[in-house]
Amino acid sequence: WITDAASRHPDLEVVMLLPIAPERLDPDGEWSSATRHGHWLQLRNIQRLKQELGDRFGVFTLLSRQTEQSSDDPEDIGLGARSVYVHAKAIIVDDEVAMIGSANLNGRSFSLDTETALVWREPDAVRQFRDRLWRHHLAEMLPDDFDPMRDSGLTLWNLASARNRVARTADRPGFAVALEMDWAA
């Protein structure tokens, strides 16, 4: 439905936030076949969105501002810092509607786990939620008069990512960094 909406609305932008690597549930630290399959599906859909939306689509991850000297999980490190693993799923549409929940798009969430989500359609509350969330991740990059219906949110995420990519880990004012597909492969 995102690609359909993008074809109808040429100004639509998509900012996607993902961890560097999927959560590991295997006790040996290996990816289970279900995790590998889910990761493959995720990459395939990201590639499709990138192909369909082009420069109107950005994928980002969050990195800690603490320097990671060593890790027992090197796939969880990017640019010298540990990934911030956000488990909540959220979507914000035009500051009009938002949803935050716990469900994953997999059989376990659909059949075994107890999941919940909250949807709200109060524009002022949705705008405040997006503003607080983006301000937390982008630090001072978000102008006070930002309007997602007028201004490019993706441009802000790209600028914050470029700044955080070259800054020393401890000096990053925000957490957002573009998720390179070679990190996620």
Task: State the predicted function of each range.
Residues 1-185:
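PLD/PLD-like phosphodiesterase catalytic module centered on the HKD motif
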